[in-house]
Amino acid sequence: MTARTDKPHEIVERTLELSRADGCVVIADEHSTANLRWAGNALTTNGVTRGRTLTVIATVDGKEGTASGVVSRSAVTAGELESLVRAAEAAAHGAGPAEDANPLVTGVPESPDFTDAPAETSSAVFTDFAPALGESFARARAGGRELYGFANHELVSTYLATSAGLRLRHDQPNGTLELNAKSPDRTRSAWAGRSTRDFKDVDPAAMDAELARRLGWAERRIELPAGRYETLLPPTAVADLLIYQMWSAAARDAAEGRTVFSRTGGGTRVGERLSELPLTLRSDPHEPGLETAPFVVAHASGDDASVFDNGLPLEATEWIRGGELKHLTATRHSAGLTGLPVTPSIGNLILDGGSDRSLEEMVANTERGLLLTCLWYIREVDPATLLLTGLTRDGVYLVENGEVAGEVNNFRFNESPVDLLGRATEAGRTEKTLPREWSDWFTRAAMPPVRVPDFNMSSVSQGV
């Protein structure tokens, strides 16, 4: 190994060699991205980026316990490693004992591709997609609508090495496509999004046709007041709600009485029935089409993550099984405090157990209700009930006698995803979906459409 190498696996090895701490974890994330943007039926920009982020976690043993220090920097080269290591060690020496301290993980076999070059994306990922998008521009132009949006593809190669002997590597592709169609006067708008690993399974023509149909629905405008309505939540909206629920499902917080998963009188609600529908909410690092890291990658400690757990193998986990709460997210530390199993968070989320009905079939079986496009600007109101507020966007449609009667105004909603699971009367066919609100952080989801008989539209919103 040379002192000036920039190969990721050699960078992490050199970083470990420089460490003087009692323990050390090094995470190198090699990023590459390719993107396209368009407006008014024409491409506007495209680009490719490359980058590296190096995270050093130093652990220092003391009389009162083990402290940790974490420092991350981007664009790090071999010549800058020592200062980064010393900064992490200084942070550890200046910190008190880490509450989540545990021995570093051992015994995980080395990844066979650990010494390989990082995976990279490029504009070639759009070779088939870009011409198909151009054809959609032409159809939209001829149909009197304008398309706006972007496509982004990212590949992150993560190299994780520790002083305890772990040498792990994971390549994570992540693609998102968001498409807006607008009427020329900007009074009507519709949205569709897709999550993809490689842009080979997205169809711009089908998305444009879907948006054209929705703009047609919006030609008839109907004003509705705030209130509770039977509502069909599409998979993207279900994903946005349940992802936030997953982020709020830390075992320790629940055991200490701070969340919706806290049991009155103490303990957690694990074992309680949350839904009368036979729904199963689960994560699996090996789920086809939604694959994610099969081991813990923790750049910092928090409610649902511990830097001491880096490299811990991940397994398929059922958070809710058949409507019953089975697990909360638990690190080794929080599992020890609560007596619950070690169940770290995993980078995908799947809800299944519904019927085989499509959203269109559920619409056809609706006497009167609302059909949403997506949710937006979701914020927490009350952690004790997980009450969330947010807005509908880009199309809310009134369904009467199995058909869309027209577009209604947007609303602000106030709902708890946990309560919604309990009140849901139907779930349809599970499909891959892109959560619109959380797509910058979480894209690997598969959800069904869900029918709620009394969704709370708390006030009218004037947005398009």
Question: Where do the protein language model's features map onto the residues?
Answer:
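Dual-mode signal for accessory low-complexity, basic/Gly-rich regions
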Residues: E110, G266-V464
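Active-site bordering "gate/hinge" segments
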Residues: M1-S306, R321-G322, G347, E403, ...
